[in-house]
Amino acid sequence: MAKKNPRNTRGKIVSAAWQLFYEQGYEETTVEEIIETSQTSKGSFYHYFDGKDALLSTLSDLFDEKYEALQETMDPDMPAMNQLLYLNGELFRMIENKVSVELLARLLSTQLVTNGERHLLNQKRTYYRLLRKIITQGQERGEFSDQQSVSEMVRLYALSERALMYDWCLRGGEFSLRQYAAQVMPGFLSSFRAENRSENRIEKTD
């Protein structure tokens, strides 16, 4: 008999919960509906979560699930900057389509005041591992400057994304998060580029 994958079970619960939160609202969603939609059991739900409130801290899980799916389909030969902008665009598209402004604002505010784990900053997340991989690759290819460390560039990228999400929440979602990010993220990340190094190499070969 095949063993039940605990990660899949937990992931099903998380995905179903956020789908329902978006479609009918957090307050209107019940644990029973989450269990039914996720096709799991009451025992499984309470094995992973104390109650519905505990699911509010799982938004980073939903994000990481998206990153894992994108990683499978993204062309690794794509320029590193394009990979970063692609990830950003697809994540923000998902946020617009699956996460309410109110719940995102609630998550960001609780992360500011919590005395417990700040899930968004957990360096073991798929998010941070993928960013480190892409940025390291960008430096090795000469696409990104080596004047900043990989860790610093990862921090700046994550900071830019959080700033955009915070502003979107602050303004009540009055604009397209994805479209606005497409306009400003290239500017935010321009310091990553190794343009000066490329120019120097060209001059030396002439």
How should each PLM-predicted stretch be described?
Residues 68, 115-141, 151-155, 159, ...:
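Amphipathic alpha-helical packing segments from all-alpha helical-bundle domains
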Residues 93-97, 133, 137, 154-175, ...:
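Amphipathic C-terminal alpha-helical segment
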Residues 39-49:
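Short hydrophobic/aromatic patch on the recognition helix
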Residues 1-8, 196-206:
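N-terminal intrinsically disordered/low-complexity leader segments
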Residues 95-115, 166:
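Amphipathic alpha-helical segments used for helix-helix packing
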Residues 58, 72-98, 150-157, 178, ...:
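Hydrophobic alpha-helical connector segments
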Residues 49, 56-63:
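Alpha-helical DNA-contacting segments of helix-turn-helix folds
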Residues 1-24, 28-40, 54:
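Basic, helix-initiating cap at the start of DNA-binding domains
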